[in-house]
A protein has these predicted regions:
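Second-shell loop/turn segments in exported
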Residues: 35-43, 109-118, 157-163, 169, ...
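A penicillin-recognizing enzyme superfamily signal
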Residues: 42-71, 82-86, 94-95, 101-114, ...
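Active-site SXXK
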Residues: 52, 89-90, 116-143, 173, ...
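Conserved catalytic neighborhood of penicillin-recognizing serine enzymes
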Residues: 136-199, 250, 262-292
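Mid-domain, small-residue-enriched loop/turn segments at the edges of structured enzyme/sensor domains
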Residues: 155-157, 190-238
Length: 465
């Protein structure tokens, strides 16, 4: 007899909750599941689970990628893991933990058990969200895409295209997933002791990225570029993005709502915890930017759900060992990972993870009769122009160097641009017209450093495009 990945997930979650709430050992909880006559009310939606199983069990949908493993004397194929959630209530409505037809019970579930490097998909969670919320930067803030420091004699960090692009808006930096601006924005959030403990604790405790390790607070690479000491799971990453999909409120996940005994008595009640983390305005600024990732970037376009506004973030790790996409529509949130179980490069020219995500999510929306949908813009935002060189209100000399974006009311530029003498440093001062910062908080300061708290660790850049 075989169980689906959904059944495996429910089984393991109920066992864990029986152990925690009833002080059972694992063997006692497992025995209760098999012999206790329990009735479990699942959050899984059979039509969604069916769509995912049908699509991801067909090798024709997963690309023709493979490599020959000499040690095993056989070909191996990239695996896939995907989670689909309702972000408003935390319900897991579909889950797949591997490619192909599933066999057996309680087999390895890559959606909940595989801990992988997230690459750039981590940036909205650990770097930009708090920076928007605390007005450290706006979408129109101008920041340098240039080396932050020398590392082993080389410029660090690098970008996927091997180039640096000079001054640009935060909106452009996040849309294109450029690495140096992300590092600079993280540095604005550094603690007095030189670590990023506050950022780490927020991600681990509030956004429930529980696989993060204490070592991830040290250095710049872990929390800015997703070069973590251990990694994260697909379920963790998908759940964390609920903070944006649910308009600023983080919603924990669940695969069941309650468990009853054979006599109808409630044994477990699974109420999800919700926490207001960001303002609706902050969440919308992120959604607006991540919509552009899907609309404009090479790897993001394939994730577009037909007729429905779609937002999301790609992630790719060094040597293309891991490919991620975490995205959402006004209705559903989903995350996907694609790669080999053992670190081996997948194709860099094709973003299978966004192709799969877009195809599966389009089928799910169509099955639900959803043919359109827009993200709701909250009050408290203004649409304002800015000079793309200074970030100030455009003046007469700014012709050809202007753009529009959303600002939280009160953070939009108010001073007219008076020249193009260089970039404006993002400042912890919520006044967006501030043009200087203290040296220890200046993210545009390039340096050669031997201070361990400033060292990238590890040094490999995220090759995200």
């Amino acid at each position: 007899e075989s169980w689906s990945y959904a059944t495996d997930t429910i089984f393991e979650e109920v066992v864990a909750d029986l152990m925690e709430k009833n002080n059972y050992s694992r063997s006692e909880a497992v025995s209760k599941m098999y012999t206790g006559g329990l009735k479990i009310y699942s959050t899984i939606q059979t039509d969604v689970q069916g769509i995912m199983e049908d699509y991801l069990s067909n090798p024709d949908n997963l690309g023709n990628e493979r490599y020959y493993n000499k040690e095993k004397d056989e070909y191996e194929y990239p695996e896939v893991a995907m989670v689909v959630m309702n972000p408003s209530n935390g319900d897991i409505i579909g889950i797949i933990g591997g490619r192909g037809e599933k066999t057996g019970k309680l087999s390895y579930n890559r959606a909940t058990q595989a801990v992988r490097q997230p690459g750039s998909s981590l940036k909205p969670l650990t770097v930009y969200g708090k920076a928007f919320e605390e007005n450290l930067v706006t979408l129109g803030t101008i920041i340098e895409d240039s080396p932050v420091m020398k590392y082993d004699g080389s410029d660090w960090p690098a970008n996927a295209d091997g180039k640096y692009h000079g001054d640009m808006s935060i909106y452009k930096a996040l849309t294109n997933s450029y690495n140096p601006p992300t590092v600079r924005v993280l540095r604005l959030q550094q603690d007095d002791d030189g670590t990023f403990s506050t950022v780490l604790n927020f991600a681990r405790d509030t956004l429930k990225l529980s696989s993060l390790q204490d070592d991830d607070k040290n250095g710049l690479a872990p929390l800015s570029l997703g070069a973590l000491s251990k990694g994260v799971t697909v379920l963790e990453m998908t759940r964390a993005f609920s903070v944006y999909a649910n308009k600023g409120t983080f919603t924990d996940s669940r695969s069941y709502t309650r468990v009853e005994s054979y006599s109808g008595k409630t044994v477990l009640q699974k109420d999800v915890s919700k926490q207001s983390v960001y303002s609706e305005q902050t969440a919308y600024l992120m959604t607006y930017t991540l919509e552009n990732v899907v609309a404009e970037t090479y790897f993001g376009r394939a994730a577009k759900v037909y007729g429905v506004e779609t937002a999301g973030k790609t992630g790719t790790t060094s040597f293309y060992n891991d490919r991620w996409f975490i995205g959402y529509t006004p209705y559903y949130l989903a995350g996907i990972w694609w790669g080999y179980d053992y670190n081996h490069s997948v194709s860099s020219s094709r973003a299978m993870q966004t192709e799969i995500w877009g195809a599966v999510m389009t089928k799910i929306h169509q099955a639900k009769g959803i043919t359109s949908g827009k993200f709701e813009q909250p009050a408290g935002l203004v649409w304002e122009s800015y000079c793309t060189i200074t970030g100030m209100l455009p003046g007469a000399q700014c012709a050809g160097h202007t753009a529009f974006t959303f600002y939280k009311e009160g953070t939009q530029p108010t001073k007219i641009c008076d020249g193009h003498g260089g970039s404006v440093d993002p400042s912890p001062d919520p006044n967006p017209d501030a043009t200087t910062t203290e040296p220890n908080s200046n993210p545009n300061q390039s340096e050669t450093t031997t201070d361990p708290s400033q060292q990238p660790n590890p040094p490999e850049p995220d090759p995200e495009g």
